[in-house]
């Protein structure tokens, strides 16, 4: 199975400007992401950026990049521009790996591509991990997903779902949660033709309320298949403090 990986990488981050170029063990962050994509077995890896400094860094380590417009409001829109520039066929699989995920397991990238390949009814695929911590179940920054019996997403939300009526009504016994709680892992595989359709879909009210762009797909009646990640990835890096915390984790290898 062949698949592409596109890595959207922006320099202008409000909380962490220049994040893709921050050095980790002597290499810029974007290179670590690129290396994980290569290790996944992807046949084509491209960094999509609107910044010449990032493009130069990618060129310096021998990577491939595409310069995109600076007007995009989401990484998916940036992907769509690259799909057009590369003349990708409509059935080609494209995996979107965020440029601030230097520690993402290569296995997860391969898994999400395989997930889409094996589910022809879906236009998108993604991953999730089980939530075992009560605090995470109630954390709005941890995006939850509920699935149907075939593994297709029914809804993504920042709220706590499903709501365990018997347990949650009594705050004194919220010490454990059941088996239905899943945290969404922000990696997506798309069919190239669908990416071009997606950017022309009207945004949904639910997407805007939750600030979750994948809800646009469900709103318009398309399917997203969700697989349980074989490896739980560490959190992404949004701030310098996140980077310090993750680098202090002795379990991470470079």
Curated annotation (Swiss-Prot):
Keywords on record: Cytoplasm, Lipopolysaccharide biosynthesis, Nucleotidyltransferase, Transferase
InterPro entries to which the protein is assigned, alphabetical: Cytidylyl_trans, KdsB, Nucleotide-diphossugar_trans
Compartments (UniProt record): Cytoplasm
Primary residence: cytoplasm
Catalytic activities: 3-deoxy-alpha-D-manno-oct-2-ulosonate + CTP = CMP-3-deoxy-beta-D-manno-octulosonate + diphosphate
GO BP of this protein: CMP-keto-3-deoxy-D-manno-octulosonic acid biosynthetic process; lipopolysaccharide biosynthetic process
Enzyme Commission code(s) on record: 2.7.7.38
CDD domains documented for this protein: CMP-KDO-Synthetase
GO function terms (MF aspect): 3-deoxy-manno-octulosonate cytidylyltransferase activity
This protein's pathway: Nucleotide-sugar biosynthesis; CMP-3-deoxy-D-manno-octulosonate biosynthesis; CMP-3-deoxy-D-manno-octulosonate from 3-deoxy-D-manno-octulosonate and CTP: step 1/1; Bacterial outer membrane biogenesis; lipopolysaccharide biosynthesis
Transmembrane segments: none
One Gene Ontology cellular component annotation held by this UniProt entry: cytosol
Function as written in the Swiss-Prot or TrEMBL entry: Activates KDO (a required 8-carbon sugar) for incorporation into bacterial lipopolysaccharide in Gram-negative bacteria.
Family note: Belongs to the KdsB family.
Protein's recorded name: 3-deoxy-manno-octulosonate cytidylyltransferase
Organism: Pseudoalteromonas atlantica (strain T6c / ATCC BAA-1087)
């Amino acid at each position: 199975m062949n698949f592409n990986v596109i890595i959207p990488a922006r320099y202008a981050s409000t909380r962490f400007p220049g994040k893709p170029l921050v050095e980790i063990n002597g290499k810029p962050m974007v290179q670590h992401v690129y290396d994980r994509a290569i290790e996944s077995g992807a046949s084509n890896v491209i960094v999509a950026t609107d910044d010449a400094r990032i493009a130069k860094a990618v060129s310096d380590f021998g990577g491939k990049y595409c310069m995109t417009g600076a007007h995009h409001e989401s990484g998916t829109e940036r992907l769509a521009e690259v799909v057009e520039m590369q003349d990708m066929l409509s059935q080609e699989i494209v995996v979107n790996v965020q440029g601030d995920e230097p520690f993402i397991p290569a296995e997860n990238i391969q898994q999400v591509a395989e997930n889409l390949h094996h589910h022809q009814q879906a236009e998108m695929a993604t991953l999730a991990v089980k939530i075992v911590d009560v605090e995470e179940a109630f954390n709005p920054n941890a995006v939850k997903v509920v699935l149907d019996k075939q593994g297709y997403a029914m809804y993504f939300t920042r709220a706590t779902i499903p709501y365990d009526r018997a347990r949650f009504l009594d705050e004194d016994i919220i010490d454990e949660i059941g088996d239905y709680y899943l945290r969404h892992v922000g990696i997506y595989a798309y069919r190239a033709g669908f990416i071009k359709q997606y950017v022309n879909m009207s945004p949904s009210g639910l997407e805007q309320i939750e600030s979750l762009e994948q809800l646009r797909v469900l709103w318009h009646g398309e399917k997203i298949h969700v697989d349980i990640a074989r490896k739980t990835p560490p959190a992404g890096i949004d701030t310098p403090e996140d980077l310090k915390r993750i680098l202090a984790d002795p379990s991470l290898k470079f």
